[in-house]
Every structure is written in C-alpha cells, then in structure tokens.
Amino acid sequence: MTDELAGKVAIVTGGAAGLGEGLVRRFAAEGANVVIGDIDRDGGAALAAEIGDNALFIEADVAEIDQVSGLVSTAVEHFGGLHVMVNNAGVSGTMHRRFLDDDLADFRKVMAINVGAVMAGTRDAARHMSKHGGGSIINLTSIGGIQAGGGVMTYRASKAAVIQFTKSAAIELAHYEIRVNAIAPGNIRTAIVRKSAAGADLQKLEEFEAKIRQQMRDDRPMKREGTLEDVAEAALYFATDRSRYVTGTVLPVDGGTVAGKVIARK
C-alpha cells in the first residue's frame, strides 16, 4: 500500500458489504479516514471496529434523503472534512419478474435508492467540497446501464440515469475543481445479489445465477469473473490525484464485456 489517501476523508454508502466493503477496506489501507454508511447495523459496526480509529459507521437508509445529508455533516464534524464521496448503495429490485408484471412500488424503491440517493449524495458532498478546494465524487453504476437487455429493466434504467447524471454533474461542478466520475462494474461476484433477492426460491436463484454467469463468461473477452479488488483499484484511481484531470468519465470494469462479444474461432 502507498498511503495515497493519507489525511483524506471518504464516505462510502452501502459500505458494510459487497463492493462497498471492498472500497472501504482499500481506502482505509491507503490511509483514508472512512465513513461507512449502511442500513446493516451489525455488519457496518463490525467492519468499522475491525478497521479501527480511522473508520466510523453511521446507520443510514439512503432512500431517506435527510439521512444522506446526515452522512456528510457527520463526516465533516467527526473527521474535519470531506474529500471523496462514493455513492455505492444500490438495489436490483424484484428479480425473476417479467416486465409486464412489474409494479410502480418496485420502480419507486429502485429509483429512490439507485438514482435519488446518488443525486443527494453528490449534491451534499459538492456543497462542502465547493467551499474547500474541490474533491472527488464516485458514482457506482453498472454495465446494465450501458447495454440494453431483457430483465431487471427498472434496474437498468436507474443505472443509465446515474451515467447521464454523472456526466452532467461533472460539467456543472468542474468550476469548483470537483471531479465526478462513475464506475460500471460487470459480473463482480458479491453477496449483494442474494441480499436483494431475499425471499426468492434459493434453488431457483442459484440456478439462474449459474446460467447467467456461465453465459457472461462465454461472451466476455476476459474469461474470469471480476473481483472486489478490480473495482477497488478503479475507485482508488478516481479518489486520488492520479485522476486530477479526469471528470465525467464512466469506466467499465467488466473484462471487456461492453466492448463486444467474443466470436468463436474454428
């Protein structure tokens, strides 16, 4: 590790597990003071305790806008500033349901968390950063927001919205030296899928996952699944001064999936 984030303060929403946990651990290892925002009280508190004094857990439901604001104000109060904001928290919505059977309740929930919380987190972080020399805002989207496809259509729409919001915010906030970028992971194996599918038939879920993952491995130029470390490396780049002239960028971390499918050679 290089201590690239020594003296910096970062917030990671949805930081108690999955991709968020990977980012929290990497940022802390690089010397950052990290605020973990999550609804998982036990998981978040345990992670903060494991990391030590440079981590703080705040129980927060990002679907509630005022709780997003509370994350920023608490981070500034506790650690003395805010340099990096990672809007990572997200949900997939109801899985294995046909679009014709979707309802507005699911749509509203997905949009509130995947889009509304990203907008609120960006706004509240930027309000502080604009008065203190700038900073970096990193939004987690998905290759599902880049490529069209059947299934989880509300999720895809929400992630596409994050991409356009990121680019627009980057333009508006560049004057303040605030960089806004997005990471679009693809096929990163975490526990988040199982959490979001709570209540679903576990056997059917496992069969569905296995089928989709095999199909994606067959189509992807790089024949492996991505890791938390792959995403953390991208986030570290955006969080540090190495990306000081990079804003409005959407970086797929997907083994080449969005570049195109592999054509079988005989």
Predicted regions and their residues:
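Canonical Rossmann dinucleotide-binding motif of NAD(H)/NADP(H)-dependent dehydrogenases/reductases
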Residues: 3-35
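Residue(s) in the substrate-gating loop at a strand-loop-helix junction
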Residues: 142
